[in-house]
Design a protein with these regions (language model features):
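An amphipathic, hydrophobic-aromatic interaction surface with interspersed Lys/Arg
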Residues: 1-165
């Protein structure tokens, strides 16, 4: 039974509220709220409240197939989003690793703070309202730029070694 419920498709509506086709329109803050929802007393109701503004009372009256379909949809979308962010993580040299660069991972607040500084926003909370796809694209661009600068620096270093010989 559980296998059948988990295989339910995304419903078009849940409790009369339209279900989006994907989660691309979410703000970064909403994604962060979803991450924190796992620690809620009722994570399922909290997830539905965050995304569709449906109360737990209304959710209890919903068709169980629709609820499971919605949850499966959200789970797959979050996997997709996490993979996108995972695919653009910066690579570090062994020297950077030895120096403790991984200790500079400040989680969600670090992303909010980085984007705020990047865009000249003085209040990090304002970044919570920015679409996650925008933050993702800026992060991807910055990481690509950083990787290019590392390669270029390495080329300059190699050229200097050749000239000194």
């Amino acid at each position: 039974l559980l296998e059948r419920l988990n295989a339910q498709p995304r419903p078009s509506f849940l409790c009369g509220v339209e279900v989006p086709k994907n989660l691309n329109a979410l703000s970064y803050g909403t994604l962060d709220d979803l991450r924190n929802a796992t620690a809620a007393e009722d994570p399922i109701s909290e997830c539905v409240r965050i995304l569709l503004d449906i109360s737990s009372v209304d959710l209890m009256n919903a068709d169980v197939n629709d609820v499971f379909g919605f949850l499966s949809f959200v789970k797959e979308e979050l996997k997709r989003i996490n993979k996108l962010f995972g695919d653009i993580k910066q690579t570090y040299s062994k020297e950077e690793e030895a120096a403790g660069v991984r200790d500079l991972d400040f989680g969600s607040f670090g992303v909010l703070d980085w984007y705020a500084r990047r865009m000249g926003i003085t209040n990090q909370n304002d970044v919570r309202d920015v679409a996650w796809v925008r933050i993702y694209q800026c992060m991807k661009n910055d990481n690509m730029q950083s990787e290019f600068e590392r390669r270029l620096h390495k080329q300059y270093m190699n050229n200097n070694k050749v000239r000194k010989r």
